Amino acid sequence: MIVLGIDPALGSLGWAVVARQLTKLKYLASGIIKTNSKDEIHNRLACINSTLEKVILEYQPNMAAIEETFVNTNSVTSLKLGYARGAIMSLCGRYNLDIREFKPNTVKKTVTGYGHAEKDQILHMIKLLLPGTSLITNSDEADAIAIAYTCHVMRVK
């Protein structure tokens, strides 16, 4: 089973690919997709989709795990994040990926044992749980790894 973990965002989206090999989880790859806030939204969404599509084609995941988003006090920000999530889900649907969504607190609790963990705690635990992640420094990327990890752990339960 190969899971594509996604920390959705319009400005700096984190993605990660984590595979289960027998009883072990293996980190395969991760990255961030940055878009320019000055670009039109459709161009930003196209950038996200084209980059994620390359990841899907290269790693052939069976499933996508996406962090659920909370409603921001700024309705415009929430709406734009909704656009990004919709574009991502549409892309996953085009490649017949099963989609699982996880609340941020669930991801934090699964990875750190504490549902209100800080970004640096998630980053620290990811490095302990998955060999190959020691050079990860970006919190969006770490969140995506944590989301993929959570998906694997939750599927076993």
UniProtKB/Swiss-Prot annotation:
Annotated residues for binding of Mg(2+) 2: E67
One biological process term in Gene Ontology: DNA recombination
GO CC annotation: cytoplasm; Holliday junction resolvase complex
Swiss-Prot/TrEMBL catalytic activity: Endonucleolytic cleavage at a junction such as a reciprocal single-stranded crossover between two homologous DNA duplexes (Holliday junction)
Cofactor: Mg(2+)
Subcellular location per the Swiss-Prot or TrEMBL entry: Cytoplasm
Entry function: The RuvA-RuvB-RuvC complex processes Holliday junction (HJ) DNA during genetic recombination and DNA repair. Endonuclease that resolves HJ intermediates. Cleaves cruciform DNA by making single-stranded nicks across the HJ at symmetrical positions within the homologous arms, yielding a 5'-phosphate and a 3'-hydroxyl group; requires a central core of homology in the junction. The consensus cleavage sequence is 5'-(A/T)TT(C/G)-3'. Cleavage occurs on the 3'-side of the TT dinucleotide at the point of strand exchange.
Protein name, as recorded: Crossover junction endodeoxyribonuclease RuvC
Organism of origin: Rickettsia akari (strain Hartford)
Gene responsible for this protein: ruvC
